[in-house]
Amino acid sequence: EKKREEKPKKKRLRIQGAAWRRLDNTAKLFAAVSGEDLSSVFRISAVLKEKVDPELLQRALVRTLPEFENFRVKLRKGFFWYYFETNTRNPCVEEEQRAPCRFIGPHRGARFPFRVSYYGCRINFEVFHGLTDGLGSLRFASRLTEHYLELVKKLPVMVQGREF
């Protein structure tokens, strides 16, 4: 009787640059319970001294996103679970026109699970809580604001006390 050689089990590599990735347990919960009535979206804003230039804010957003590759995703609904899929598009800055913290659903095509908007002198960063927590969103919003101010002032800007 021939003995079968057992093949060693291959470990599944978790590559950050993969086309999709699983949500952590908290993100699974937020994705499952979120909807129009319970958005699970929160906002961080930066208030400036001058009116926001939308074109420069768009350039700052495109410049910021490569520093936060985990944010370059879209939320998708699979057969059994939600997951993040790599999003190759660039997000678009929009003028704030509706109520803040609106639902960001997985059924909206190529949308990102965050939104960057402006109103007057204010830059808004709204994010689905399944993507990041307050600290991650604060880092993103701070870096976005830094890039924006660098483009406006045409010189490097360092946020004071950036230990968060």
What are the language-model segments listed below?
Residues 1-164:
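Non-catalytic N-terminal regions of enzymes
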